[in-house]
Regions:
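Membrane-embedded helical hairpins/re-entrant loop segments and their flanking transmembrane helices
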Residues: 21, 47-87, 257-328
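Membrane-embedded alpha-helical modules
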Residues: 105-226, 335-396
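Hydrophobic transmembrane alpha-helices of multi-pass solute/ion transporters
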Residues: 7-18, 191-195, 208-257
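Intrinsically disordered, low-complexity non-transmembrane regions of multi-pass membrane transporters
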Residues: 1-27, 168-173, 227-240, 276-283, ...
Length: 396
């Protein structure tokens, strides 16, 4: 950006550098746009599994909490307290990796889900003490298989949403699988594809969001958008602890803890990527430990108030490389944006007013990208007979 032309490379690579306010606001908003859809989508999916109507007050609440606690967890990373936080520009958001586990837990009850999230988050934070020592247990073969399997599991969910929604209630509607739903989903996919490959910068990074906005506007003209929920929603609301209860289920807790290990390894990779790509150095043990602490504590606190598990967002790591600005104050501004959005139910209601087929088009793209990320991890694997056998059995 023109206002950064006179800034030295040393400052741009310095996490403590504070750019001019107008630059920080623009860059911070870019970080929010790059992660917004990925952050709120898991909440909408879990709301559907829990039986909450699309656009209901409970769905709006879960969307709010996903924004609010993504912002709070990000502040834990950028500002930190004590040993908590990498103190690097690490953007946090709701993790897709936990969605398969959360779907099963939500079917048992929301109290069971949030009990698992809180305890899983505490276990995640505990791993910060020794995360560096167990990284070698999760080579690209293991991590890649897990991420690929998650993506493959989730893609059918996206297809159901594109058709008009998952679950018996949505699938029993006469419009389910109709041309109107598929048309909206396909518009999202085509616009996202076009913007990703034929534009650059923040437009390319926000291609899925812009694709969904395009389809949303078309849906308004089709008469498929109900604005009544926005009118009813309040302008301001605080989070409510244990709104859905807190129940202990050993199976769910074990599953959450296992996925926390995967999430912790992902965060370590993202922090390493930020340090290497943004500052041309290796991440320190203190940064890796602090980042893992923030990941876990952010998840545990979110679970208390109805938020879902948080992790670092890889797309924002790429955005740092693209802008060349390593400043953690920029991501702090992004966190403040998210917190403000999370305190305004009308924003959650606006997101929830989106036709479910529009969301379906977006999640087909995003879940496909999750699977692609797993394949990318596997590209560095030495495909000998041993590894091929491990891959075949694990994927089956």
């Amino acid at each position: 950006m023109s206002t950064l032309e006179n800034v030295s490379q040393e400052d741009l690579k310095n996490p403590d550098y504070v750019p001019p306010l107008q630059v920080g606001l623009v860059l911070g908003l870019q970080h929010v746009l790059a992660m917004f859809v990925s952050n709120v989508t898991p909440s909408i999916i879990i709301a559907g599994v829990a039986g909450f109507a699309f656009g209901s007050a409970d769905t709006v609440f879960l969307i709010q909490m996903s924004m609010l606690f993504a912002g709070i967890a990000t502040l834990m990373q950028t500002i930190g307290f004590g040993p908590v936080g990498a103190r690097l520009p690490v953007m946090q958001g709701t993790s897709f990796a936990f969605v398969p586990v959360m779907i099963g837990a939500a079917k048992m009850g929301m109290g069971t889900l949030f009990g698992g999230i809180v305890i899983g988050g505490l276990f995640h934070a505990f791993m910060g003490s020794f995360i560096g020592k167990i990284r070698h247990w999760f080579p690209p073969l293991v991590s890649g298989i897990i991420i690929l399997a998650i993506g493959i599991y989730l893609i059918p969910v996206g297809i159901q949403y594109a058709a008009g929604g998952a679950g018996e209630f949505n699938m029993s509607k006469p419009t389910w699988g109709g041309l109107g739903n598929w048309s909206l989903a396909i518009i999202v996919i085509l616009v996202s594809f076009g913007l990703k490959f034929w534009t650059k910068g923040i437009i390319s990074s926000s291609s899925v969001l812009l694709g969904m906005i395009t389809a949303y506007i078309i849906a308004i003209f089709m008469g498929d958008v109900n604005f009544s929920g926005i009118d009813k929603a309040a302008w301001f609301a605080l989070p409510e602890p244990f709104k859905y209860g807190f129940d202990i289920n050993l199976t769910v807790i074990i599953a959450m803890c296992l996925m926390s290990i995967v999430s912790a390894i992902e965060t370590v990779g993202d922090i390493s990527g930020i340090a290497k790509g943004g500052a041309n150095r290796e991440a320190t043990d203190k940064e890796l430990q602090g980042g893992t602490y923030a990941d876990g504590i952010g998840t545990a606190v979110a679970g208390i108030f109805g938020g879902l598990p948080n992790t670092s967002f890889s797309q924002n790591v790429g955005l740092i490389s693209m802008t060349g600005v390593m400043s953690r104050s920029v991501v702090t501004i992004a966190a403040i944006f998210l917190i403000l959005c999370g305190l305004v139910p009308k924003i959650g209601a606006l997101v929830s007013s989106m036709p479910i087929a529009v969301l379906g088009g977006g999640v087909i793209v995003m879940f496909g990208m999750v699977a692609s990320a797993g394949i990318n991890m596997l590209s560095s694997v030495n495909w000998n007979r041993r590894n091929m056998m491990i891959f075949a059995i694990s994927l089956s």
